């Protein structure tokens, strides 16, 4: 059974932190499996997510405070799951959070398969901040 954790980081308060978490989560070496990149954007394009997140914040006057939420969904090492299946589950979970731009990136490089979620702290629909 998968578990989901919120990763609290002081870096979530600034643009440099947002850039860093997106770069880390989307690295080819961690997300490529059998020639396929396990990266999906929910309400955004992963390659330009930083710009899209910031455009949403500027549009709604929400450029201060927390920039993003970083969550990780992981499976125990003894659970047999393919990276593709883990990614599909992660994308479904992310899609259940309406109104937010989310990058989902599944890593297959550790002892267990896990997926990262980088969620814009501001809703593109309402302009309000996400509260976990």
Where are these regions (language model features)?
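N-terminal nicking endonuclease/strand-transfer module with a His-rich metal-binding environment
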Residues: 1-132
């Amino acid at each position: 059974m998968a578990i989901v954790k919120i990763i609290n980081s002081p870096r979530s308060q600034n643009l440099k932190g947002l850039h860093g978490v997106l770069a880390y989560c989307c690295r080819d070496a961690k997300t490529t499996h059998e020639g396929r990149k396990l990266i999906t954007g929910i309400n955004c394009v992963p390659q330009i997510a930083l710009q899209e997140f910031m455009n949403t914040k500027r549009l709604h006057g929400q450029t201060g405070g927390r920039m993003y939420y970083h969550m990780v969904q992981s499976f125990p090492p003894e659970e047999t799951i393919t990276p593709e299946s883990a990614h599909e589950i992660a994308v479904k979970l992310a899609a259940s959070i309406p109104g937010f731009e989310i990058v989902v990136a599944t890593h297959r490089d550790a002892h267990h398969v896990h997926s990262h979620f980088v969620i814009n702290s501001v809703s593109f629909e309402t302009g309000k901040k996400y509260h976990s």
